[in-house]
UniProtKB/Swiss-Prot annotation:
Catalytic activity: Endolytic cleavage of (1->4)-beta-galactosaminic bonds between N-acetylgalactosamine and either D-glucuronic acid or L-iduronic acid to produce a mixture of Delta(4)-unsaturated oligosaccharides of different sizes that are ultimately degraded to Delta(4)-unsaturated tetra- and disaccharides; Elimination of sulfate, appears to act on linkages between N-acetyl-D-glucosamine and uronate. Product is an unsaturated sugar
A GO biological-process term: carbohydrate metabolic process
pH dependence comment: Optimum pH is 8.
Family indicated by similarity: Belongs to the polysaccharide lyase 37 family.
Signal sequence segment: 1-27
Induction: By ulvan and rhamnose.
Keyword terms, alphabetized: Lyase, Periplasm, Signal
Top-level enzyme category: lyase
Intrachain disulfide bonds: none
GO cellular component: periplasmic space
Major place of residence: periplasm
Protein name (database record): Broad-specificity ulvan lyase
Subcellular location: Periplasm
Amino acid sequence: MKRRNFIQLSSLATIGMSLPSAGIVNACSSFPEQSLEFKNLTSELLKEWCDGMLKVQINNPSNLEEHGALRCPSCSHIHGRCMDAVYPFLYMADVSGDEKYIEAAKLVMIWAENNVSQENGAWTVIPNPKSWKGITIFGAIALAESLHYHSHILDDKTLKAWTNRLARAGQYIYDTFTIDFTNINYGGTAIYGLDIIGDVLGNGNFKEKSKKMAEEVQAFFTKNDYLLYGECKPEADKLSAKGLHGVDLGYNVEETLNSLVMYALKNDDQALLQIVTKSLNSHLEFMLPDGGWDNSWGNRMYKWTYWGSRTCDGSQPAFAMMAHINPAFGTAAVKNTELLKQCTANGLLHGGPHYISAGIPPCVHHTFTHAKPLAALLDHWKHLPEINKTTALPRVTANGIKHFKDLDVLLFSRGDWRGTVSAYDAEYHYKKDYRQATGGSLGILYHNKVGLLCAASMAVYNMVEPYNQQPQPGKDIALTPRIETFKEDQWYTNLYDLTANLEAIDTKEVINLASVVKLKNESRKMVSGTASEFHLTYSCAKEGLTIKVSTQQDILEPTAFVLPIASPEKEKVEFVNEHEIKISKPGGVVTIKANVPLKLKEYSGTRTFNMVPGLEALPIELFFETHIKELVLIVSVV
């Protein structure tokens, strides 16, 4: 069988002509010599990851519970989805001719069949037949792509066995998946999954269901911003008190939108292409200049890694394959891949920008999932549009305020400053609180010269998915800037205020964002016996960001504003005086000044570290004093 390409030029050309855009390029011919720099980056990173996975693959035929699996440097268990690596391994085997990659692909499949394979055709997330089976769709896509593009390098016995196994998995997905049977990423991903499985197996029923689901998913985009929604429990269409849907940027850009784009291009689905183009443009507003994804507000940000989401696949296919519509999509694909490279060490992708500097071991899950989309890009390379970094990202050129009505989230930009303020009240779970940035909090603060300065974490780090997250090392200190007080060992903060609203004014010189917030505990009970209501304002000018916190109520308990500044331990910190701190970064010096003394929260070591989004930080705090009812904090960069 010769290597084939599902997504043909005709689809790319059609969508390029039907969606007017100043950035459309000619999609009617191949680009074998274009995008060479990005191709080299992609190829080299994929090889680095595959070789890294080879180093942790277990070869122990005497113990079938581990033989063939990928040992995780950070987790005590084996990840059931490690068989997803079959696709990148087989790709590497095909292009390199090296038998070691074929053997690696066979080994991960052997482990899966011995440990997570079920009679009904499913695979489970761990070696427990009662555990979650929805992940079958991801393994099935990996196996289908392996067989479609690279089956010619397999021996007949393996080819037959894997084809039969794919048929069983496909039948399970066909029988059990609907568009909204759980979080939208599963039904959405099954659209492409059933389609490609149907092609590999010649099963028309699978393709018909895929087409039906592709029509159904079009109802799951928000009214104003075309953000894909449905990442919430117990129903995908659950609304918050403000009437907002559950949206998660990480799952959307790294998983579901990939599936929708690849299906729509492959089948020339013009209706779906129109919608996903609008959706990609909206999601792209949240990419930061360095290629990081701003998921500070996302419903499932408990898996936010700055470059994406812990167990998703990567955003490269959706954005790269649509770069003929908007060249900035291509920029996004390149910049994010560069960030993935920066977060890679010893052949494995680490879960955030400061994992390596903090000495936090990586979870192998990041690598075997993010290797798949790189293989997919390379398998389609001759049919991709031109991909480069020449077109600026929206957040690079932004100047002013952008309000996402469907999230109640504000993006602000002035000079070199970029920031996100959130009053988003949607919740992932209907019983438990996995708090993302809200309550008028600053989810992101970024400066073009020095990079990321602030990034939200969970209010309290929680192992929402214990098999897909790493334990928090050391003391858990939230990274989200906030107002806080403690009373009778209860923590009260605006991070739990889901009723806050935002106001914004741009004078062309200064952007002013304001919110009235209340201090509440995790049970949403407001603090009593001390000030509970505060005015929180952010004023952004070219010269810097000024944060003011004030109240008209009596402050009877120690109350502070906390500003954690992202900073790896190698950066020099100077306490100029009790009101001023300087942090030296490669691109400049960050200065924090306040009208009251600045202190650091207590923690061990030289920095605190938070798993979300994988950052080291200096948790600066400043307390209200008896005669002062307004805190004034200024952040500047020179």
